[in-house]
Amino acid sequence: FHLLRSFLPGMKAKREGWIFPVLSMAAREAFPGWSGYCASKWALDGMITALRAELAGSGLRITSLFPGATDTAIWDDLPGSWNRGAMVPAREIARAVGFALDGDPASLVEEIKIGPAGGAL
């Protein structure tokens, strides 16, 4: 939110730029025990979806990223036992973002939802 407030005016003035908010599968799915986290992600998704509509035709682009459990160091400090081998490799997230960036300027990948092949962990 604060980054958008800081950078959006300049991006609008230049009529160019790409915003890649990293949300979470928790913005679209309810996870028991994570209600506060889910609520914050649902709210952010709503704000970004509205902003995408507001910016249509402005030259600015927004591609929302909804990663599921991704194998990164963040899991090192979380309590519990996590099957890191079943998580999405971080390089796959990068490949998905690259796909969106390399697309034809006449099209827009609005959302990327990528999660573990076996479902939510």
Regions found by a protein language model. Name each.
Residues P67-D77:
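Short, flexible catalytic-loop segment of classical short-chain dehydrogenase/reductase
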Residues L4, S40:
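Active-site helix of classical SDR
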Residues F31-S35, A86:
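Active-site loop immediately N-terminal to the catalytic Tyr-X3-Lys motif
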Residues M11, E29, A50-L60:
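Active-site-adjacent segment of SDR/Rossmann-fold oxidoreductases
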Residues S24:
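Residue(s) in the substrate-gating loop at a strand-loop-helix junction
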Residues M11-K12, I74, M87:
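Methionine-biased hydrophobic packing positions in alpha-helices, especially
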Residues G57-L60, S64-L65, G80-L121:
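C-terminal helical subdomain
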